[in-house]
């Protein structure tokens, strides 16, 4: 990739995907904000470990190992926003690739269904400045719709 293409790719807007799920916003929020569930619905997540035993709140951190391309990369994510049952936000705080995620949940059909929208962007640091445009964004563009379908399938099959 030519350097001008890297700069152009780095300025691309965040990715946004929505999906409708036949579960209440409270059910969706409870599941999606529990870090232990990440490997169940996010394809690239290899493992998750919470830092501390306190209940999940804004400021809570988790160590997440993801498969990016052919390698596994560890990073720490911090929950920056937690507004049950309507929104949450997470940001990567270390590692070469730092994801920034914002999720919103809208009630549908008198709250019996939900529309989940996830907005995702990345910051590259060090080698991550190359990884983000060359590998990470492409992988995420393919994975985000699959992850949302996985989330829908898990929740509609009765996952708690």
What is the predicted role of each segment?
Residues 14-16, 72-76, 98-102:
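Short, surface-exposed coil-to-beta transition loops
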Residues 2-52, 57, 150, 157-159:
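Hydrophobic ligand-binding cavity/cleft-lining segments
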Residues 27-32, 38, 62, 79, ...:
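Hydrophobic pocket/interface hotspot
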Residues 25-26, 53-56, 81-85, 104-115:
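A short, structured loop/turn motif at beta-sheet edges
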């Amino acid at each position: 990739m030519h350097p001008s293409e890297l700069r152009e790719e780095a300025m691309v807007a965040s990715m946004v995907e929505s999906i409708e799920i036949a579960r209440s916003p409270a059910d969706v929020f409870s599941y999606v904000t529990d870090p232990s569930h990440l490997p169940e619905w996010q394809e690239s997540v290899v493992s998750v470990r919470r830092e501390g035993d306190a209940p999940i709140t804004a400021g809570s951190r988790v160590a997440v190992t993801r498969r990016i391309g052919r390698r596994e990369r560890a990073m720490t994510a911090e929950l920056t926003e937690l507004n049950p049952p309507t929104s949450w936000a997470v940001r990567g705080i270390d590692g070469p690739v730092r994801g920034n995620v914002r999720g919103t949940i809208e009630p549908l059909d008198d709250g019996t269904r939900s529309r989940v929208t996830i907005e995702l962007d990345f910051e590259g640091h060090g080698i991550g400045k190359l990884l983000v445009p060359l590998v990470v964004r492409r992988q995420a563009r393919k994975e985000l719709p699959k992850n949302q379908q996985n989330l829908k399938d898990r929740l509609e099959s009765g996952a708690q």
